[in-house]
Amino acid sequence: MELVLGYLFIFVARVTDVGMGTVRMIMVVKGKRIQAAAIGFVESIIYILAIGKVLEALDNPVNILVYATGFAAGNYVGIYIEERMALGNIIAQVMCDHNVMQLVDLLRDAGFGVTVVEGYGRTGIRHLLNVSLQRKNLSKLYNVLDTHDHKAFITVTDARSIRGGYFTSVKKK
């Protein structure tokens, strides 16, 4: 029983510390120093405890296998947590084929700020819609776009920071 509890400890510790590491890296990229430092502190303690348990019985290959499995699962869990947190801002660029101003009105009515840029494509004048939004509102943007033009061309990029502009609260349905 003690052996199984040891395996479980190693696995859970690795899932926890690697998951925290993934979230910590996102905090670093987003410039959230204090949160990244706090997560890193706890993460390193958990890591030392897990590796210490493995090194106690390095001749036990199951310890190493459980350690590696916990690492892999921790990456998965960390990405899942980061997706659920949906931190930060993004910029969506949208090109649609028809009724551009109707789409602009729909997006603005839904609470999104929209800037329209006119350009020239292969078939003539095209309109590019720039929409700056919080990442957590991306699915709401997709819902509005799908109801208007499910064939719209959309690119989404991360924005390190956004300053100024027109922002309202995205309206809930």
UniProtKB/Swiss-Prot annotation:
<dbReference type="InterPro" id="IPR022930">
    <property type="entry name" value="UPF0316"/>
</dbReference>
<feature type="transmembrane region" description="Helical">
    <location>
        <begin position="61"/>
        <end position="81"/>
    </location>
</feature>
<dbReference type="Pfam" id="PF18955">
    <property type="entry name" value="DUF5698"/>
</dbReference>
<dbReference type="InterPro" id="IPR044035">
    <property type="entry name" value="DUF5698"/>
</dbReference>
<dbReference type="Pfam" id="PF10035">
    <property type="entry name" value="DUF2179"/>
</dbReference>
<comment type="similarity">
    <text>Belongs to the UPF0316 family.</text>
</comment>
<feature type="transmembrane region" description="Helical">
    <location>
        <begin position="38"/>
        <end position="58"/>
    </location>
</feature>
<feature type="transmembrane region" description="Helical">
    <location>
        <begin position="3"/>
        <end position="23"/>
    </location>
</feature>
<keyword id="KW-0472">Membrane</keyword>
<keyword id="KW-0812">Transmembrane</keyword>
<dbReference type="GO" id="GO:0005886">
    <property type="term" value="C:plasma membrane"/>
</dbReference>
<keyword id="KW-1003">Cell membrane</keyword>
<dbReference type="InterPro" id="IPR019264">
    <property type="entry name" value="DUF2179"/>
</dbReference>
<protein>
    <recommendedName>
        <fullName>UPF0316 protein Amet_0954</fullName>
    </recommendedName>
</protein>
<keyword id="KW-1133">Transmembrane helix</keyword>
